[in-house]
Amino acid sequence: MYVVSTKQMLNNAQRGGYAVPAFNIHNLETMQVVVETAANLHAPVIIAGTPGTFTHAGTENLLALVSAMAKQYHHPLAIHLDHHTKFDDIAQKVRSGVRSVMIDASHLPFAQNISRVKEVVDFCHRFDVSVEAELGQLGGQEDDVQVNEVDALYTNPAQAREFAEATGIDSLAVAIGTAHGMYASAPVLDFSRLENIRQWVNLPLVLHGASGLSTKDIQQTIKLGICKINVATELKNAFLQSLKNYLTEHPEATDPRDYLQSAKSAMRDVVSKVIADCGCEGRA
């Protein structure tokens, strides 16, 4: 009952004018903080993991943890495959019980991207699994990229409609100027492009690379159709910096049950802020 597909979550967000945050988890403490905070705020959240996270923790272990915590807190949770690229890997995890998938073939030419994504969609929809795919590519900040090159990396609004119709995806991740990781300076998001995509595509839209974005920018993207906000680096950085500071100030510390508390507190602040920025408190 409590481990759910993201499809209904994102459709509700689209109707309600808010976004659902997807937090990439890397250890037990991250998952505890995300679930506890979401439950306290009655906010819908998505537990996301890259292939590396699933390899590190084990698919069955992650599924068991999410299921147990959803029941413990009486709070619906979705567990989501983030940036997965291999069909066989996705199929295995779906058969294990995962109900939300992002197939990332955005590095491929347009026609091949469609073909790869449609293969995954056709398989996943047999299991009532929701599928997200990306059109366009996120990068880092590269000063030597020319305007026409940047445009080629961003999501083309007209192509977005063709892509959505040809693949049958449930949500679309768009490239409008965000990047994975934290920003050295404030990014310039292409809001007009996002608005055009919204006019061409009626699916819930997804924003990757949201770590470090301002509240104003996040809320503006939501007004223009973003229904899912991905956060990873911001959580990792909060965990790491707090842990470093604690161990520097308490070099005698040896018990992780003690020294991880400050790291959890720092992550809790991040999760609370993202939920507030997404406007999803009280929506679960």
UniProtKB/Swiss-Prot annotation:
It comes from the Bacteria. It catalyses: D-tagatofuranose 1,6-bisphosphate = D-glyceraldehyde 3-phosphate + dihydroxyacetone phosphate. One of its GO terms (molecular function) is tagatose-bisphosphate aldolase activity. GO terms for biological process: D-tagatose 6-phosphate catabolic process; galactitol catabolic process. Its EC number is 4.1.2.40. Its cofactor is Zn(2+). SUPFAM superfamilies: Aldolase. Pathway: Carbohydrate metabolism; D-tagatose 6-phosphate degradation; D-glyceraldehyde 3-phosphate and glycerone phosphate from D-tagatose 6-phosphate: step 2/2. It is an enzyme of class 4 (lyase). Binds 1 zinc ion per subunit. InterPro entries: Aldolase_TIM, Class_II_FBP_aldolase, FBA_II, TagBP_ald_KbaY/GatY, TagBP_aldolase_GatY. CDD domains: TBP_aldolase_IIB. Dihydroxyacetone phosphate binds at G181, G209, A210, S211, N230, V231, A232, T233. Zn(2+) binds at H83, H180, H208. The keyword Lyase applies. Coiled coil: none annotated. The active site is at D82. GO terms for cellular component: cytosol. Keywords: Galactitol metabolism, Lyase, Metal-binding, Zinc. Belongs to the class II fructose-bisphosphate aldolase family. TagBP aldolase GatY subfamily. Catalytic subunit of the tagatose-1,6-bisphosphate aldolase GatYZ, which catalyzes the reversible aldol condensation of dihydroxyacetone phosphate (DHAP or glycerone-phosphate) with glyceraldehyde 3-phosphate (G3P) to produce tagatose 1,6-bisphosphate (TBP). Requires GatZ subunit for full activity and stability. Is involved in the catabolism of galactitol. Forms a complex with GatZ. This is D-tagatose-1,6-bisphosphate aldolase subunit GatY. It comes from Shigella flexneri.
